[in-house]
Amino acid sequence: MTLDDVMNFAADQERGREYELADPVDGTPTGIKLWIVGPDSETAHKARLALSDELSELADADGRVSAESREKARLNCLARHVIRWDVKEGDEAVPFNTKNLLRLLNVQWVQAQVDAFAADRRNFR
């Protein structure tokens, strides 16, 4: 591997990769598709910085952040890794926006799948 390979690998992660959520019980495809950036992308880097800023703003005078606030900040960070989607509700496409994305990510098994995919560099080769 050369320095060019390293730099190109990180830059390529910015495009994101398609991930289709799997049914949490039987693993079958759900038809819900998300495009997620890789952990070395600039978008992921900015998401981590925004997480730090958000936690700093939420801290009380003693530097403590409630568990509820930490969880909200973590979900916001995870949402910043998703750059587009193909999601339907009934027969209608669901608009891609932060509110709708956080609504989806509030489901525990969805969070787990998105987080695992986003963190695994093998998905971005």
Predicted features, each with a name:
Residues 6-10, 21, 117:
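Extended hydrophobic/Leu-rich segments
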Residues 1-15:
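Extended acidic low-complexity intrinsically disordered regions
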Residues 9, 24-26, 72:
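Generic marker of residues within folded, mature protein domains
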Residues 28-125:
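Short, surface-exposed, charged amphipathic helix/loop patches that serve as local interaction elements
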Residues 15-29:
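Short acidic-hydrophobic surface loop/beta-edge motif
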